[in-house]
Structure formats: structure tokens, C-alpha cells
């Protein structure tokens, strides 16, 4: 009798195992890695999220420094993490090249781009906003753009130029003066000074605190994420609030709202910023990945 009971127990366990477990490969997202991007593709896709890294970073950094990609793909959102970096502004040719890379990935891997959101951290937010503008003015865009977001990004290049000048004038934190010199020299070379070349900044900056600059995005859902920890910035960089990306992004947000964009959001956080394991308010981690996914899902309905 013991033999019979054991036989039936084994049979029941095997039956449950065969019927109740979906093969792992059917659930796991596909991962595609190329020199220009990493793609996470869920089995059942409902949206596409395109992410751009910070200035010296790449797709691997994006995934390592934030849970956004893995949380999104776990919820049926394909994630295209781009390696394109080192740009706070872009030429028209560069914009079309990156859009072409996105279009190529969508076509080659059968990605549904009918619900697309673009976002980036730091300079990656600059790239995201510039590409959003380019996609919106394209007669035949390769993706249907539903929203864009920037994470503590230096979108206002006039503000960035002026803050770099202030950094050079400070007697403290000499180690950051090289960065300020580089930014001023680069902007002088590319656009001229804001005082003498205001039209160039109006044309090339991702966003300025002006109606003309924000007008192309007045109907697009857009988010500005920032963690304005003024005590941290004062201690570590001798920066006041008006020198932070948070200050410039708030002005841009307010201008968008004044233009009639009811779906522009300025999102501040507290104590979330961690960069490479260390406390830093300028970080991917200030974004609540679960809430971001909910926002994307809402835009995709």
C-alpha cells in the first residue's frame, strides 16, 4: 500500500509541475546588445521607453545606476538604452542620425513604437528633449511620441553658461574650475556668448525660459525630475539654489504651464539621489521607477 501511495504522490507532483509552470524562456525578456544600444524586449509589449545616459556614461551605466529599465520591461515596456552621449546640444545631422538608429532598432527587432516615451539623465535629458522636438516636427516620424522626461538636466544653456562663469569666480572648490572652463569654451565655440548670440541659444538649446523655446512642446506630456538638496550642493560645490539645474528646470516648467501645457510636471524628490553608491542628488535614482512606469502606462492607453 505504501508503494501505491508513493506512486500517486509522484504522479500528482509531476502533473502539477507540467501544467502550472510556464517555461522560463517564454517569460524572460530578450536582450540585444549592440555597439550603439542595448534593447530589452518583453514577450508581450505595450510601450517603448528610450533612455539616454549622462555625459560620460553608456547603456550599461544607465542599467546599473537605476531600476527604471528592469522595472519597465517587467511591466511589458520595451526599453532601448542608447550609448549616445557627450552632448548637451546636437546638430540637425546628429539628431537625424540618432533618430535613424532608433528607427533601425525598431524595424530590425520588431518593436512596437506606437507608444514611445523618451527620457534621459543629465545631458541625456538634453538629448531627449532635442530629439522629442525633432520627432514632433518630422512629417513621417519613426516612433509615435507620447511623452518625454529629463532627470536633473542642464536644459537651459544660457543658465549653464552663467553658472559656469560664477564657478570660475569662486575661491572655493578649485577642482571644478576645469569643468567650468570647458563648458564656457565649448559654448563660446559652438554658439558664442549668450550676450552676443542670443538667437543661437534660442535655436540650439534644448529649452530656455522663453515662450519661443518651449512652444514646440506645449502639447506634449513632459516631466522634469530634480532633487534640489541645497544643503548638499552648498557643502560640496558652494552652489546656491539659483545655480542648480532645479532652478532652471522650474522656470522652464512654469513657462510651459503658462503656454497652456497642463501635462507638464515638475517633480522634486528628497533623499533619493545615489550615484555609484554614494549620496548625490544628481543621479538617475531620484526617479521613482514604479511611478514612472505607471505614467508611461497611462500615456499608452
Task: Say what each PLM segment does.
Residues 16-17:
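C-terminal motif of bacterial Sec signal peptides marking the signal peptidase cleavage site
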Residues 20-44:
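N-terminal cap/lid segment of alpha/beta-hydrolase-fold proteins
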Residues 41-48, 217-219:
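Proline/glycine-enriched tight loop/beta-turn segments at coil->beta junctions
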Residues 46, 51-90:
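Short substrate-entry loop that stabilizes the transition state in hydrolases
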Residues 56, 163-215:
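Mobile cap/lid helix-loop segments that gate and shape the active-site cleft of serine hydrolases
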Residues 90, 223-232, 246-301:
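C-terminal catalytic histidine-bearing segment of alpha/beta-hydrolase fold enzymes
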Residues 90-109:
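Alpha/beta-hydrolase active-site loop
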Residues 107-108, 114-171:
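Primarily recognizes the serine-hydrolase "nucleophile elbow" in alpha/beta-hydrolase
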Amino acid at each position: 500500500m505504501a508503494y501505491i501511495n508513493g506512486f500517486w504522490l509522484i504522479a500528482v507532483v509531476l502533473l502539477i509541475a507540467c501544467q502550472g509552470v510556464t517555461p522560463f524562456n517564454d517569460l524572460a525578456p530578450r536582450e540585444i546588445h549592440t555597439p550603439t544600444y542595448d534593447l530589452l524586449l518583453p514577450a508581450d509589449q505595450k510601450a517603448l521607453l528610450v533612455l539616454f545616459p549622462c555625459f560620460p556614461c553608456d547603456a550599461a551605466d544607465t542599467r546599473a545606476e537605476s531600476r527604471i529599465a528592469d522595472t519597465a520591461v517587467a511591466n511589458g515596456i520595451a526599453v532601448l538604452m542608447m550609448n549616445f552621449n557627450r552632448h548637451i546640444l546636437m546638430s540637425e545631422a546628429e539628431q537625424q542620425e540618432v533618430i535613424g538608429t532608433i528607427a533601425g532598432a525598431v524595424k530590425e527587432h520588431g518593436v512596437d513604437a506606437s507608444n514611445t516615451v523618451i527620457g534621459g539623465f543629465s545631458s541625456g535629458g538634453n538629448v531627449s528633449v532635442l530629439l522629442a522636438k525633432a520627432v514632433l516636427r518630422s512629417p513621417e516620424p519613426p516612433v509615435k511620441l507620447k511623452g518625454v522626461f529629463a532627470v536633473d538636466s542642464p536644459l537651459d544653456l544660457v543658465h549653464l553658461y552663467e553658472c559656469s562663469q560664477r564657478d570660475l569666480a569662486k575661491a572655493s572648490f578649485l577642482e571644478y574650475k576645469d569643468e567650468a572652463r570647458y563648458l564656457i569654451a565649448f559654448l563660446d565655440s559652438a554658439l558664442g556668448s549668450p550676450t552676443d548670440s542670443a538667437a543661437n541659444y534660442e535655436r540650439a538649446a534644448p529649452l530656455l525660459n522663453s515662450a519661443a523655446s518651449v512652444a514646440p512642446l506645449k502639447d506634449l506630456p513632459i516631466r522634469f525630475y530634480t532633487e534640489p538638496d541645497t544643503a548638499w550642493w552648498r557643502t560640496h560645490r558652494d552652489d546656491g539654489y539659483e545655480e542648480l539645474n532645479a532652478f532652471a528646470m522650474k522656470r522652464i516648467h512654469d513657462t510651459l504651464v503658462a503656454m497652456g501645457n497642463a501635462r507638464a510636471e515638475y517633480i522634486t524628490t528628497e533623499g533619493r539621489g545615489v550615484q555609484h553608491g554614494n549620496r548625490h542628488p544628481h543621479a538617475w535614482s531620484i526617479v521613482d521607477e514604479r511611478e514612472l512606469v505607471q505614467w508611461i502606462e497611462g500615456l499608452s492607453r
